[in-house]
Amino acid sequence: MVISIGCDHIVPDIKMKISEYLKSKGHTVIDNGTYDFVRTHYPIFGKAAAEKVASGEADLGVILCGTGVGISNSANKVKGIRAALVRDVGTARYAKEYLNANVIAVGGRITGIGLIENIIDVFLEAKYKPTKENQEIIKGIDELIENDKGQFGNEHFFDEFIEKWDNGGYPKE
């Protein structure tokens, strides 16, 4: 299976452990960054990882930030993505079986690496259980977003914000 991964500057170390874990299980990993602890914007990497799934280049996605909240929200802005923020294996299973989630987000600073690995295993092994009710729910979710043609696949989409950051336009932590 091809898995698209991405993270923010808070958890690149966790992302690399997850990448190695996935590879050890025989998966191909598309790493969308970030690669270091230099302050950056999580929407860049949530969007990049999600677009690989939406385009069909990857089968599923795993994204991480400190809590998983921000990066899951950014991934969910990509048409065709159903990203679920998960902190336990039961939620991972539910997200896949009933909502056909194609991306999971995990908080790398609040969830231990062993549990993250278990969550990923359950998510990858779970199978969607199509029912009329599930299909109607998913259809409704998928119809909530209309892609801005200037956004999808546009690697320069965040340039304005990055320039503002580089020029001191945002407060440093």
Swiss-Prot record:
Belongs to the LacAB/RpiB family. This is Galactose-6-phosphate isomerase subunit LacB. Heteromultimeric protein consisting of LacA and LacB. PANTHER family: DNA DAMAGE-REPAIR_TOLERATION PROTEIN DRT102 (PTHR30345:SF0), RIBOSE-5-PHOSPHATE ISOMERASE B (PTHR30345). Keywords: Isomerase, Lactose metabolism. Its EC number is 5.3.1.26. InterPro entries: LacB, RpiB_LacA_LacB, RpiB_LacA_LacB_sf. Pathway: Carbohydrate metabolism; D-galactose 6-phosphate degradation; D-tagatose 6-phosphate from D-galactose 6-phosphate: step 1/1. It is an enzyme of class 5 (isomerase). Disulfide bonds: none annotated. The gene is lacB. The keyword Isomerase applies. One of its GO terms (molecular function) is galactose-6-phosphate isomerase activity. It catalyses: aldehydo-D-galactose 6-phosphate = keto-D-tagatose 6-phosphate. The keyword Cell membrane does not apply. One of its GO terms (biological process) is D-allose catabolic process.
